[in-house]
Amino acid sequence: MLPARPTSWKGHEVLIKAVAALNRPDVTLLLLGAGDGAPRFVAGLEQLARKTGLDGRLRIAAGSDDMPSALMLADVIAMPSTVPEPFGRVAVEAGAMGRPIVAFNHGGAVESVLNGQTGWLAEPGDISDLSRALGTALDLSQEKRAELAKKSRAHIIKSFSKEKMCQKTLEIYDELLQNRARTSDNIIR
């Protein structure tokens, strides 16, 4: 599943191609949120699905008011943004829910996804590498999936909880104030 607004740089087309390359008739791709896009955008995704052989295995839906439930229904959460996202909330939300994440190795995903532990990071723009990572995630045994979920939740709590984010923000303010004080001291001398 790709939970993302209907914007071309979110990687909908890249993901369709990567899922098609898996050549697995048991896999259905859900583009959650893409259904809110302009009819031309949606039609383009449907046309690409037909062209790549995903016809009948692509679902395009509007956004959900209950993202935790939507995330729990997915076997894998994909973040194939073609442009690095500064934070990428989807990876943190999916990690908190213990879902395997597959993303490109750039932007916020570099911090939120621990490659091989809480998900997989593919080479940016490399559809074959993204497809390989998706296959790895889909092939996880129940035992490995449970282990990944535990690691993923622990990583998110440790690194992205409200308390941790406040602590990091205050540390930045403190550093800026110390730098300002040092600069002021140098000017006075």
Task: Describe the residue ranges of each PLM region.
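Nucleotide-activated donor-binding/catalytic signature segment of Leloir-type glycosyltransferases, i.e.
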Residues: 42-64
